[in-house]
Amino acid sequence: MNRQFRAAARVLIRPMIPGLLVILLAAVSACSDDPDNPEQQVRDMISAGEEAVEARSIIGVLDFISDEYQDKDGRQKQEIKQLVAGYILRNKSIHMLTRMQHVALNDDETRADVILYVGMAGVPVASVDQLVFTRADLYRFDLSLVLEDGDWRVARGDWHPARLEDF
């Protein structure tokens, strides 16, 4: 029965987990070479977030999700916390390859919309060509970031499967 429960949980949760991790990776703050350039801050944050997810730092990642987070399915920060913790604990190794397609800041530069493509695998992935051989999961993420107390945080995230050609 325990095996059946775990199998059912994987079927239900697996499609959500990679998306949640990438949403969370986008929330991790980082210093920019040009602290006055919000777009560069967002790009640096994505890079630092990738490192936090690969380091499997649950607390490090979750600290940067907005307390006001809510996605289209009604999930809030607490549900994200549970899903991320479960995914990180079940995976001994997490490796990501990210490609940012688009960053758009609002007029007062306190909100940003990001389109991000992510390949997630259990082994290191250094190039798009390796995504095929590692059987990586490929996703497109549409993220809404908000500037809170000087740090960019994820306020909303939606995702769906991507194709290799998207990278």
Give the positions of each predicted feature.
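Sensor of tandemly repeated, compositionally biased sequence architecture
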Residues: 12-16, 148
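Bacterial N-terminal signal peptides
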Residues: 15-27
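Short solvent-exposed beta->alpha transition segments
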Residues: 62-107, 111-113, 117-120
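Soluble non-cytosolic domains of exported or imported proteins
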Residues: 36, 40, 55-56, 74-78, ...
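Short structured motifs
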Residues: 46, 83, 96-102, 127-129, ...
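Short, low-complexity N-terminal intrinsically disordered segments enriched in polar/charged residues
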Residues: 30-58, 63-64
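Exposed beta-sheet edge and beta->alpha loop/turn motif
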Residues: 105-167
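N-terminal secretory signal peptides that target proteins for export/translocation
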Residues: 1-13
